[in-house]
């Protein structure tokens, strides 16, 4: 969306080239968009960023950050320290969705965009300092899916 809106978008692949079928399919979708994908050996310059988007890990994260993920989170922290808005996708990387525990080096976002609905971790007081402001994004899940 940002690229289509005229923003200059640069994407870094935190853990290298995709390996799973879903990741490979999304990589192909990315190639069709007006974005720059950094080569693995090209270090990005977080000082130049206006907005940094954390999409390193998702709701399945638990435990500790892998070295590549740790490096990506450190880069995001540098961007935030330089004045960039740090936006997390669904959940800041390094937070465990089930428990609210944060791994050392977990992302501290200014804004978290939660898909469809808040997750239990979003209400956990321990997660508040990592999530920042939380907003919901409608991704088209029918209301009937919310009924138990």
Predicted regions and their residues:
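A cross-family phosphate/adenosyl-ligand binding-site feature
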Residues: 1-52, 57, 62-67, 128
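YjeF_N-associated NAD(P)HX repair module
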Residues: 49-148
């Amino acid at each position: 969306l940002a690229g289509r809106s005229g923003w200059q978008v640069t994407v870094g692949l935190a853990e290298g080239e995709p390996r799973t079928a879903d990741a490979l399919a999304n990589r192909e979708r990315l190639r069709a968009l007006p974005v720059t994908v950094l080569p693995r050996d090209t270090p990005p310059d977080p000082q130049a960023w206006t907005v940094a988007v954390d999409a390193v890990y998702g709701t399945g994260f638990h435990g500790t950050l892998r070295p590549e993920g740790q490096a990506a989170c450190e880069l995001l922290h540098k961007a935030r320290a330089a004045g960039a808005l740090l936006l997390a996708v669904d959940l800041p990387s390094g937070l465990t969705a089930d428990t609210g525990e944060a791994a050392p080096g977990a992302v501290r976002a200014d804004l978290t965009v939660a898909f469809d609905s808040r997750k239990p971790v979003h209400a956990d007081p321990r997660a508040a300092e990592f999530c920042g402001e939380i907003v919901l994004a409608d991704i088209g899940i029918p209301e009937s899916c919310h009924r138990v």
